[in-house]
Amino acid sequence: VVRQNTGLDFQTAVNNELQGGKSLVYKSYGDYCKEGQHSPNWYFASEDVLKLYMDPRNSLHENAIFQFEQLTYNESYHTEAAVETFLKNTFMNSNSPAPKTDMTFSHIFWAIGAEQQVSPFHLAARVYQEQGQGTSPLISGNYPGYEGYYNYFNISASGSTNEQVITNGLNYARNNGWDNAYASILGGANVISANYIKKGQDTLYLQKFNVSTTASNPVYTHQYMQNIAAPTSEALSMKKLYESAGALENTFVFKIPVYENMPASPCPMPTSSTNVVLQVPAGYDASTIYVDGIPYTPQVRNNRRIVTVPNGNAQAAVVYRYNENGAPIGMYVWT
């Protein structure tokens, strides 16, 4: 185990990760974990649920610790047969060639991992995390206007609508000539290794939460994914991979981030929230929000105003519009 002293205050790190749409949760999470909708399936994460995932102490167990594994190649157990074993229960399990190649997926991941000096298990787990059952238009090869192009790692596949996500990702694939599975996986692996692993973001945790002050990119920037649960879910996939390959008894290096001013005990999963989340219309004064008649100065996150009230039973919130003399000339009410 390697101790990574970030030198960062924990609350400051959380506050920065709450901004700019950096941290999202899936729609299945409870409302107390959400602070407004980002896109059809994703919501801005609440402060408390973000703390749960950012607190390394919550992940120091077998099913989650692999988010701290250093992701470099190890020829002693990163074998093609081990990769094939991992892929057995995924959409990449076939002995048939991968799309528009003469190679199996297991050979592709193994060969690229050795070439890039990156764990092929990590590459396979990342694609599995991104693609699930393998039905995404990003890897179908037949999306209208982008026939014959593939983006297995979802590189640059972002946007506020599903169509934007798909077209942005496939534009990137087309611009980079990813016209077969090997080219797409090699290209994506290059992005991950050159832009992340070889630049100091060499764990799953650091690729989501860049809190490394020695990495090439400034802290809180250059983050691979928005899903705050991704490092934990990918870590479980990695653990299962090592287990299936009989590699759990191998030597691993885990790099654990350490923050300043951590809470005395691990941050728990929230079960409720007393936050009121509002989008204030243009022209209204958002500096003070009245909730049940009491004035609050809100926090600002992701173009929303967040007010923490004493309990979860708020009945109404009000903001005012003022003229040039400071006299109220209108109000907007939420109930």
Predicted regions and their residues:
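Cell-wall glycan-active module
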Residues: 1-116, 197-275, 315, 332
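Catalytic and binding regions of secreted/periplasmic enzymes and modules that target cell-wall glycans
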Residues: 125, 129, 136-257
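Short proline/glycine-enriched turn/loop motifs at strand-loop junctions of beta-rich domains
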Residues: 280-286, 313-314
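Short, aromatic- and glycine-rich surface loops/edge beta-strands on solvent-exposed regions
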Residues: 314-323
